[in-house]
């Protein structure tokens, strides 16, 4: 999801990878 990518970039790549 694009949202996850944005959140991951803002909060941390860790979250982005988890949601990806």
Curated annotation (Swiss-Prot):
Inducing factors: By tunicamycin.
Keyword Iron-sulfur: no
One GO MF term attached to the UniProt entry: ATP binding
Protein's cellular compartments: Endoplasmic reticulum lumen
Keyword check for ATP-binding: yes
Alphabetically ordered keywords of this record: ATP-binding, Endoplasmic reticulum, Nucleotide-binding
GO cellular component terms given for this protein: endoplasmic reticulum lumen
Signal peptide positions on this chain: none
Superkingdom, natural source: Eukaryota
Function of the molecule: Probably plays a role in facilitating the assembly of multimeric protein complexes inside the ER.
Record-stated family: Belongs to the heat shock protein 70 family.
Protein name: Luminal-binding protein
Organism expressing this protein natively: Phaseolus vulgaris
Lineage: Eukaryota, Viridiplantae, Streptophyta, Embryophyta, Tracheophyta
């Amino acid at each position: 999801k694009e949202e996850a990518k944005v959140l991951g970039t803002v909060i941390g790549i860790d979250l982005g990878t988890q949601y990806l």
